[in-house]
Amino acid sequence: MDMRVPAQLLGLLLLWFPGARCNIQMTQSPSAMSASVGDRVTITCRARQGISNYLAWFQQKPGKVPKHLIYAASSLQSGVPSRFSGSGSGTEFTLTISSLQPEDFATYYCLQHNSYP
């Protein structure tokens, strides 16, 4: 059975941090996609300037609070399935789901969790 459901992704995320002297623009692509169970899915997040590895990924389902998947660009949060992985440093980052499961259909966000002067 082919389960094709659009996985909604955040297209543009502008973040402001208290005390930070600059704003770093984060852009995700694709902004939306269609995928099937078992597919390998990759989402890209780009920073306008280098942010080292200060990047986190979150998953959010309708009516639920965001779930923290990955921190420091590639470290898997406790309890998150190993099919999720993150990579990248500097300005380009990726979130990969190696084999999409029905429970993975959701919105995914990247978050730059530290700012630089």
Curated annotation (Swiss-Prot):
One of its GO terms (biological process) is immune response. Residues 23-117 form the Ig-like domain. SUPFAM superfamilies: Immunoglobulin (SSF48726). V region of the variable domain of immunoglobulin light chains that participates in the antigen recognition. Immunoglobulins, also known as antibodies, are membrane-bound or secreted glycoproteins produced by B lymphocytes. In the recognition phase of humoral immunity, the membrane-bound immunoglobulins serve as receptors which, upon binding of a specific antigen, trigger the clonal expansion and differentiation of B lymphocytes into immunoglobulins-secreting plasma cells. The gene is IGKV1D-17. Disulfide bonds join 45-110. Immunoglobulins are composed of two identical heavy chains and two identical light chains; disulfide-linked. This is Immunoglobulin kappa variable 1D-17. Residues 111-117 are annotated as: Complementarity-determining-3.
